[in-house]
Curated annotation (Swiss-Prot):
Family: Belongs to the NadD family.
Keywords: ATP-binding, NAD, Nucleotide-binding, Nucleotidyltransferase, Pyridine nucleotide biosynthesis, Transferase
Lineage: Bacteria, Pseudomonadati, Thermodesulfobacteriota, Desulfuromonadia, Desulfuromonadales
GO terms classed as biological process: NAD biosynthetic process
Naturally occurring in which organism (per UniProt): Syntrophotalea carbinolica (strain DSM 2380 / NBRC 103641 / GraBd1) (Pelobacter carbinolicus)
Name the record gives this protein: Probable nicotinate-nucleotide adenylyltransferase
Pathways per UniProt: Cofactor biosynthesis; NAD(+) biosynthesis; deamido-NAD(+) from nicotinate D-ribonucleotide: step 1/1
Amino acid sequence: MKLGILGGTFNPIHSAHLRIAEEVRERCRLDRILFIPAATPPHKELAGEIPFADRHAMVAAAIADNPDFAVTDLENRRAGKSYSVHTLELLRQEYPRDEFYFIIGMDSYRSLGIWKDFPRLFELTNLVVAARPGSPCDDPLRLLPVVIQEQFCYDENAHMLRHQSGHVVIFLEETFLDISSTHIRQLVAAGRSIRYLLPSGVEHYIYRHGLYRSQERS
Protein backbone atom coordinates (compact mmCIF):
# COMPACT_ATOMS: atom_id res chain seq x y z
CA MET A 1 0.00 0.00 0.00
CA LYS A 2 1.15 3.53 -0.77
CA LEU A 3 0.71 5.40 2.51
CA GLY A 4 0.82 9.18 2.82
CA ILE A 5 1.90 10.52 6.22
CA LEU A 6 0.92 13.99 7.42
CA GLY A 7 2.05 15.10 10.85
CA GLY A 8 1.40 18.28 12.78
CA THR A 9 0.06 19.69 16.01
CA PHE A 10 -3.40 20.06 14.41
CA ASN A 11 -4.32 22.70 16.98
CA PRO A 12 -6.88 22.65 15.44
CA ILE A 13 -6.93 20.78 12.14
CA HIS A 14 -8.52 22.89 9.38
CA SER A 15 -9.50 22.87 5.73
CA ALA A 16 -6.02 23.72 4.42
CA HIS A 17 -4.57 20.59 6.06
CA LEU A 18 -7.32 18.47 4.53
CA ARG A 19 -7.01 19.98 1.07
CA ILE A 20 -3.24 19.38 0.96
CA ALA A 21 -3.78 15.78 2.04
CA GLU A 22 -6.44 15.21 -0.61
CA GLU A 23 -4.37 16.73 -3.42
CA VAL A 24 -1.28 14.71 -2.49
CA ARG A 25 -3.36 11.54 -2.26
CA GLU A 26 -4.80 12.13 -5.70
CA ARG A 27 -1.68 13.32 -7.52
CA CYS A 28 0.66 10.71 -6.02
CA ARG A 29 -2.00 8.00 -6.32
CA LEU A 30 -1.80 7.05 -2.68
CA ASP A 31 -4.05 4.47 -1.10
CA ARG A 32 -4.43 6.25 2.22
CA ILE A 33 -3.34 9.33 4.16
CA LEU A 34 -2.41 8.78 7.81
CA PHE A 35 -2.68 11.87 10.04
CA ILE A 36 -0.27 11.87 12.99
CA PRO A 37 -0.96 14.48 15.69
CA ALA A 38 2.25 15.43 17.52
CA ALA A 39 2.29 14.69 21.23
CA THR A 40 5.33 16.82 22.16
CA PRO A 41 6.54 18.89 19.18
CA PRO A 42 10.33 19.34 19.25
CA HIS A 43 10.53 22.73 17.51
CA LYS A 44 7.48 24.66 18.74
CA GLU A 45 5.44 25.32 21.84
CA LEU A 46 1.92 23.92 21.87
CA ALA A 47 -0.37 26.96 22.06
CA GLY A 48 -3.19 26.87 24.55
CA GLU A 49 -2.01 23.68 26.27
CA ILE A 50 -4.65 21.70 24.39
CA PRO A 51 -4.34 18.02 25.38
CA PHE A 52 -3.37 15.41 22.83
CA ALA A 53 -6.73 13.69 23.30
CA ASP A 54 -8.60 16.79 22.10
CA ARG A 55 -6.37 17.33 19.08
CA HIS A 56 -6.62 13.64 18.14
CA ALA A 57 -10.41 13.78 18.52
CA MET A 58 -10.62 16.86 16.29
CA VAL A 59 -8.67 15.09 13.55
CA ALA A 60 -10.95 12.07 13.87
CA ALA A 61 -13.98 14.34 13.54
CA ALA A 62 -12.49 16.10 10.51
CA ILE A 63 -11.88 12.91 8.54
CA ALA A 64 -14.84 10.83 9.71
CA ASP A 65 -16.53 10.88 6.30
CA ASN A 66 -13.42 10.04 4.24
CA PRO A 67 -12.44 6.35 4.04
CA ASP A 68 -9.10 7.32 2.46
CA PHE A 69 -8.02 9.21 5.59
CA ALA A 70 -7.05 7.73 8.97
CA VAL A 71 -5.56 9.01 12.24
CA THR A 72 -3.19 7.37 14.71
CA ASP A 73 -2.25 8.06 18.32
CA LEU A 74 1.24 6.66 17.72
CA GLU A 75 3.14 9.67 19.05
CA ASN A 76 1.16 9.67 22.29
CA ARG A 77 2.07 6.04 22.93
CA ARG A 78 5.76 6.75 23.40
CA ALA A 79 7.72 9.00 25.73
CA GLY A 80 9.81 11.99 24.73
CA LYS A 81 9.62 14.55 21.97
CA SER A 82 7.80 13.77 18.72
CA TYR A 83 10.77 13.51 16.38
CA SER A 84 9.74 12.55 12.84
CA VAL A 85 12.57 10.07 12.41
CA HIS A 86 11.46 8.11 15.48
CA THR A 87 7.85 8.17 14.34
CA LEU A 88 8.80 6.85 10.91
CA GLU A 89 10.87 4.07 12.44
CA LEU A 90 7.88 2.99 14.54
CA LEU A 91 5.58 3.21 11.53
CA ARG A 92 7.97 1.00 9.59
CA GLN A 93 7.50 -1.65 12.27
CA GLU A 94 3.71 -1.34 12.08
CA TYR A 95 3.53 -1.18 8.27
CA PRO A 96 6.57 -3.18 7.08
CA ARG A 97 5.29 -3.67 3.53
CA ASP A 98 3.94 -0.20 2.83
CA GLU A 99 5.59 2.50 0.74
CA PHE A 100 5.71 5.76 2.72
CA TYR A 101 5.18 9.30 1.40
CA PHE A 102 5.97 11.82 4.13
CA ILE A 103 4.24 15.15 3.43
CA ILE A 104 5.90 18.42 4.46
CA GLY A 105 5.74 22.07 3.45
CA MET A 106 8.45 24.02 1.67
CA ASP A 107 9.39 25.83 4.90
CA SER A 108 10.03 22.48 6.59
CA TYR A 109 12.03 21.28 3.59
CA ARG A 110 14.28 24.33 3.82
CA SER A 111 14.92 23.63 7.52
CA LEU A 112 15.59 19.89 7.36
CA GLY A 113 19.14 20.50 8.54
CA ILE A 114 17.90 21.15 12.10
CA TRP A 115 15.75 18.01 12.23
CA LYS A 116 16.97 15.15 14.38
CA ASP A 117 18.89 12.51 12.38
CA PHE A 118 17.66 14.10 9.15
CA PRO A 119 19.78 11.91 6.79
CA ARG A 120 17.90 8.89 8.12
CA LEU A 121 14.58 10.31 6.89
CA PHE A 122 15.48 9.62 3.27
CA GLU A 123 16.27 6.00 4.07
CA LEU A 124 12.83 5.50 5.61
CA THR A 125 10.45 7.32 3.29
CA ASN A 126 9.74 9.23 0.13
CA LEU A 127 9.09 12.94 0.73
CA VAL A 128 6.35 15.04 -0.81
CA VAL A 129 7.04 18.77 -0.54
CA ALA A 130 3.91 20.88 -0.89
CA ALA A 131 4.59 24.39 -2.20
CA ARG A 132 2.34 27.37 -2.77
CA PRO A 133 1.25 28.00 -6.39
CA GLY A 134 3.64 30.27 -8.25
CA SER A 135 6.56 29.53 -5.95
CA PRO A 136 8.41 26.67 -7.66
CA CYS A 137 11.74 25.52 -6.32
CA ASP A 138 14.23 25.89 -9.19
CA ASP A 139 17.17 24.21 -7.45
CA PRO A 140 15.82 21.90 -4.73
CA LEU A 141 19.11 20.07 -4.35
CA ARG A 142 20.87 23.23 -3.18
CA LEU A 143 18.31 23.71 -0.40
CA LEU A 144 19.32 20.44 1.23
CA PRO A 145 22.09 20.32 3.85
CA VAL A 146 25.46 20.15 2.09
CA VAL A 147 26.46 16.96 3.90
CA ILE A 148 23.79 14.92 2.09
CA GLN A 149 23.59 16.62 -1.31
CA GLU A 150 25.87 14.04 -2.94
CA GLN A 151 23.35 11.33 -2.02
CA PHE A 152 20.85 12.75 -4.53
CA CYS A 153 20.47 13.36 -8.23
CA TYR A 154 17.91 15.74 -9.71
CA ASP A 155 15.46 14.47 -12.31
CA GLU A 156 14.55 17.71 -14.07
CA ASN A 157 11.86 16.17 -16.29
CA ALA A 158 10.01 14.65 -13.34
CA HIS A 159 10.87 17.59 -11.06
CA MET A 160 12.01 15.31 -8.27
CA LEU A 161 15.15 14.32 -6.40
CA ARG A 162 16.23 10.69 -6.39
CA HIS A 163 18.04 9.43 -3.29
CA GLN A 164 20.65 6.68 -3.32
CA SER A 165 18.27 4.54 -1.24
CA GLY A 166 15.75 4.52 -4.08
CA HIS A 167 13.39 6.94 -2.37
CA VAL A 168 12.41 10.20 -4.05
CA VAL A 169 11.57 13.77 -3.07
CA ILE A 170 8.54 15.00 -5.02
CA PHE A 171 7.68 18.70 -5.36
CA LEU A 172 4.03 19.64 -5.88
CA GLU A 173 2.37 23.03 -6.18
CA GLU A 174 -0.81 22.77 -4.13
CA THR A 175 -3.95 24.85 -3.83
CA PHE A 176 -3.15 27.43 -1.18
CA LEU A 177 -5.85 28.16 1.38
CA ASP A 178 -4.76 31.05 3.59
CA ILE A 179 -5.99 29.45 6.82
CA SER A 180 -3.95 29.02 9.98
CA SER A 181 -4.62 27.32 13.29
CA THR A 182 -3.35 30.45 15.06
CA HIS A 183 -5.99 32.60 13.37
CA ILE A 184 -8.74 30.12 14.20
CA ARG A 185 -7.73 30.14 17.87
CA GLN A 186 -7.77 33.94 17.86
CA LEU A 187 -11.23 34.03 16.29
CA VAL A 188 -12.63 31.67 18.91
CA ALA A 189 -11.08 33.73 21.71
CA ALA A 190 -12.64 36.86 20.22
CA GLY A 191 -16.06 35.23 19.95
CA ARG A 192 -16.07 35.37 16.16
CA SER A 193 -17.24 32.78 13.63
CA ILE A 194 -14.91 30.02 12.43
CA ARG A 195 -17.49 28.48 10.12
CA TYR A 196 -16.11 27.20 6.78
CA LEU A 197 -12.49 27.44 7.95
CA LEU A 198 -12.68 23.87 9.20
CA PRO A 199 -15.10 20.94 9.07
CA SER A 200 -18.32 21.41 11.01
CA GLY A 201 -17.49 18.41 13.20
CA VAL A 202 -14.33 20.15 14.39
CA GLU A 203 -16.19 23.42 14.93
CA HIS A 204 -18.78 21.66 17.06
CA TYR A 205 -16.07 19.86 19.06
CA ILE A 206 -14.30 23.15 19.82
CA TYR A 207 -17.46 24.81 21.11
CA ARG A 208 -18.74 21.74 22.95
CA HIS A 209 -15.48 21.38 24.88
CA GLY A 210 -14.82 25.09 25.34
CA LEU A 211 -11.44 25.03 23.60
CA TYR A 212 -9.41 28.21 22.90
CA ARG A 213 -11.79 30.58 24.68
CA SER A 214 -9.28 31.65 27.32
CA GLN A 215 -6.49 32.54 24.88
CA GLU A 216 -5.29 36.10 24.60
CA ARG A 217 -7.35 38.12 22.17
CA SER A 218 -5.61 39.88 19.33
